[in-house]
């Protein structure tokens, strides 16, 4: 499995599932020996840590500039442009952003509350087409959190509200022109359009989150606070994810912003 490129966490989950399965079979006397006993789980150090892709300081500025572009008639070039800037400077997970409602925004106190998540599910009847479902929970217990808004995030969401808020706090911040849920595919397409126009070699929403985290590291914020803002279940996850980011890249971020 390691040779196939699977991550340590994926292999560990498979190992634990198989081990539990065969242990139960031994208990039920369906087999006499657990074949997983002789299987050695590779250590985490044996895996090559992937280099996270993050935007440089100049690229973050360029992203903001392009995402907020206006057409000749004054209309926004990108319907979700201000929303994407907001995500870039709050570090929200994709599902958290798509599940965000106006009631979760507290502009007076400069904060946003994260307490739910959007996932794509099937109907359970064999149809391949998936539909969006709002989970009244997030990825981890620590994921329920309040994130303070910096000036850029506050301005971006204020502009978004001025354009799209209709007075209903139950409405979702990210929704289509017809009022339906925006899907991960839709939002990924939107962010990639901004990347392309800005001539940034990047793809996907996750880069916005990684860039914000790296930006906070470069600014010298303590890891325990970064972990809390990101909604990680432990500080160790934050370390494991971001300590390998290239230092020169971090230095470029902090000097360019």
Language-model-detected regions and their locations in the chain:
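N-terminal core-binding DNA-recognition domain of tyrosine site-specific recombinases/integrases
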Residues: 1-23, 27-33, 71-76, 181-186, ...
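Basic, Lys/Arg- and aromatic-enriched nucleic-acid-binding interface segment
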Residues: 12, 31, 37-94, 98, ...
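C-terminal catalytic core of tyrosine-transesterase DNA break-rejoin enzymes
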Residues: 27, 85-96, 185-197, 207-233, ...
């Amino acid at each position: 499995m390691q040779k196939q490129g699977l991550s340590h966490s994926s292999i560990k989950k498979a190992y634990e599932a198989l081990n539990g399965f065969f242990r139960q079979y031994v208990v039920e006397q369906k087999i006499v020996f657990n074949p997983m006993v002789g299987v050695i789980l590779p250590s985490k150090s044996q895996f090559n840590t992937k280099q996270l892709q993050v935007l440089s300081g100049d690229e973050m500025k360029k992203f903001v500039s392009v995402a907020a572009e206006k057409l000749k008639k004054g209309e926004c070039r990108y319907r979700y442009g201000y929303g994407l800037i907001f995500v870039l400077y709050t570090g929200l997970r994709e599902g958290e952003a798509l599940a965000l409602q106006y009631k979760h925004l507290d502009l007076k106190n400069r904060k946003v509350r994260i307490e739910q998540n959007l996932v794509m599910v099937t109907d359970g009847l064999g149809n391949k087409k998936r539909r969006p479902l709002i989970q009244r929970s997030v990825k981890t217990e620590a994921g329920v959190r309040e994130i303070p808004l910096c000036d850029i995030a506050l301005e971006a969401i204020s502009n978004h509200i001025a354009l799209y808020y209709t007075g209903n706090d139950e409405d979702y911040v990210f929704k289509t022109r017809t009022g339906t849920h925006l899907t991960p595919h839709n939002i990924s397409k939107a962010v990639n359009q901004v990347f392309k126009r800005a001539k940034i070699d990047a793809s996907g929403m996750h880069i916005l989150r990684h860039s914000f985290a790296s930006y906070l590291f470069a600014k010298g914020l303590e890891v325990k606070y970064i972990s809390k803002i990101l909604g990680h279940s432990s500080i160790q996850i934050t370390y494991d994810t971001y300590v390998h980011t290239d230092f020169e890249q971090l230095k470029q971020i902090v000097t360019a912003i």
